[in-house]
Regions:
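Substrate-binding cleft of secreted/luminal carbohydrate-active enzymes
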Residues: 363, 442-453, 470-539
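Active-site groove signature of glycoside hydrolases
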Residues: 324-325, 348-383, 515
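C-terminal motif of bacterial Sec signal peptides marking the signal peptidase cleavage site
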Residues: 19-22
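Boundary/entry segment of secreted carbohydrate-active catalytic domains
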Residues: 41-43, 48-49, 227-276, 414
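Aromatic-lined carbohydrate-recognition surfaces of secreted/lumenal glycan-active proteins
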Residues: 319-331, 363-370, 392-424, 442-443, ...
């Protein structure tokens, strides 16, 4: 948090008194109480970019002559901008007119149940504005039910009301304790309680309670999830391995030099992401080892051969990835692609095992196909896709184990496609069917501007580790040392060490099996490598 922001918090905290709970005389926490207790904070929306998120912006059926629009303004509390919301009411309706902007869930979702305190949003209005500001939490108590993963008919809306903030001409921080939200509309379950781990999205709604014809505008910025969570870091966690993604550019690499640099920072194990590479634009199917008799390979490199030679000379260990396949992007419940991948992986494994199955530096095997817990473009969130994925993983792992005693690893991506508790249960259902999978290296997706390190990661890590522990799988983390984001647009680059250190310390609270993707953004000369070197030296 910047010094400027801290000053603004002190200067502009809303003095609005919170209402008493409808069902008791218990005093709700004040804004000051919550901010004093808040520790780890996640930005849910910075409102800096117009097109990073898909929004619903609508008028309600009773407001056919009303309007709402949004723009990016350079008047902001933090970051590069804020959203300016402009609205109008006709004043000619038999019911209260209403307009709203809404963001609903999907992948990379938030889970408000993690050490919950409340939400916070900055608002800047105009003294002439008419209308009431209503912030609504949308929840789906039955989300991810088999057959109906998502159903808007189940949505419930719980609102927090501020009748003054739209007329405040200075930036005002509206702090909203969860206890102050009340059920207002949607699916009525009788006992309508806020379930913070079934958060589907939110709506900012303005209602024309006075029934007058008017126009108005206000700005919103920096919607935050406030938690009481303070990470308890353990010692000095270290990387146990590092990934390398092979390519033809490594044809003449001095592996003695690379391995010595790796050992200089205490990393003695490398994971070769895959033994082959496909460049579909050139229609070139590449093998990174020789010899190969696989009919689809058109070009061969001896890169892995030289890596194994150098590994033996330098006391390094190698975990070897197999066929670089991918799952169906259209139908994960169809057996054809799984069957194809099984056969390709068996053939690649057989060649690799013949070359290095008894090599002293071979430390394990890696099934390369990356799955995720999300839904885009298709996923494995429900049956039969879930069990078909598990069966595929087990089939390949069992084939490996029939010939090699070495550990079998996988590295799916954490897309946060489900709430943390359901995500943990989902992984548990997979691992219950994959007894020959030994190690999970969970991609933290920390290089893609899609995750909060100290709110999202501890929550999901805990649930998934529980599933691993229950099924005899080692929980590990695959930390991304690169930075490449779609929104905001950031081209592929190495990240600052300070960011990587936070990821490493968070992972270290849950495991000592911590790998790093990848050597290309962690090699000598990068800020990540040099910073890590100082870190392990205690400097």
């Amino acid at each position: 948090m910047t010094a400027m922001k801290k000053r603004m918090i002190l200067a502009t905290l809303s003095s609005l008194l919170l209402c008493m709970a409808a069902c008791s005389n218990k005093q709700l926490p004040t804004s000051e109480d919550i901010l004093t207790e808040a520790r780890a904070v996640k930005t849910l929306n910075a409102y800096d970019e117009m097109n990073c998120v898909v929004y619903d912006m609508k008028v309600t059926p009773a407001s056919p002559k009303s309007s709402i629009d949004r723009f990016v303004s350079d008047d902001c509390v933090e970051g590069a901008g804020s959203f300016e919301i402009r609205y109008s009411f006709s004043g000619n309706s038999s019911e209260a007119e209403s307009v709203y902007i809404q963001q609903s869930g999907g992948d990379y979702r938030s889970d408000l149940s993690f050490h919950p305190l409340g939400l916070s949003i900055w608002v800047k209005g105009n003294k002439n504005n008419k209308g009431t500001f209503r912030f609504m939490i949308i929840q789906d108590a039955g989300m991810f039910t088999q057959g109906t993963l998502h159903d808007k008919g189940r949505w419930q809306f719980f609102e927090y009301v501020d009748k003054e903030v739209l007329t405040q001409e200075e930036w005002t921080r509206v702090v909203m304790p969860y206890e102050a939200f009340t059920f207002v509309k949607g699916h009525d379950m009788g006992d309508n309680k806020l379930m913070l781990n079934r958060f589907e999205g939110y709506r900012i709604e303005v209602t024309n309670d006075e029934g007058v014809m008017c126009t108005g505008s206000f700005c919103i910025d920096n919607l935050e999830q406030l938690t009481s969570y303070a990470p308890e870091f353990k010692g000095t966690p270290k990387f146990s391995s590092v990934f390398i993604q092979l390519d033809g550019v490594y044809e003449n690499t001095d592996w003695d030099k690379e391995f010595k640099a790796s050992q200089e920072v205490g990393i003695d194990t490398w994971i070769i992401q895959y033994a082959e590479g496909f460049n579909d634009r050139a229609e070139e199917k590449t093998s990174f080892y020789v010899p190969t008799k696989l009919p689809w390979v058109t070009k061969q490199y001896d890169i892995m051969n030289r890596m194994f030679e150098a590994a033996k000379q330098n006391g390094m260990k190698l975990i070897v990835g197999l066929y670089p396949g991918d799952y169906s992007k259209k139908d994960t419940a169809s057996p054809e692609q799984y069957d194809f991948l099984v056969e390709r992986n068996k053939q690649v494994f057989d060649e690799l095992f013949a070359l290095w199955g008894n090599h002293p530096c071979l430390d394990g095997w890696y099934i390369t196909e990356e799955f995720h817990d999300g839904s885009y473009p298709v996923g494995w969130q429900q049956e039969p896709s879930l069990s078909m994925l598990a069966n595929y993983l087990q089939t390949v792992a069992a084939y490996i184990k029939s010939k090699s005693p070495k550990e079998v690893c996988i590295a799916p991506a954490l897309w946060r496609g489900m709430p943390a508790d359901l995500c943990g249960e989902w992984f548990g259902k997979i691992f219950a069917q994959t007894p020959d999978i030994d190690v999970l290296y969970l991609q933290d997706i920390g290089g893609r501007c899609l995750v909060d390190f100290d709110v999202d990661l501890p929550n999901w890590f805990a649930g998934i580790k529980k599933a691993c522990d229950a099924n005899g799988v080692i929980f590990g983390v695959d930390i991304e040392s690169f930075k490449e984001c779609w929104c905001p647009k950031i081209t592929m680059r190495t990240k600052p060490w300070s960011e990587l250190e936070e990821q490493l310390r968070v992972a270290g609270m849950f495991t000592d099996h911590i790998t790093n993707f990848s050597w290309a953004t962690f090699k000598p000369g990068t800020d990540t490598y040099e910073g890590y070197k100082r870190y392990i030296e205690g400097k």
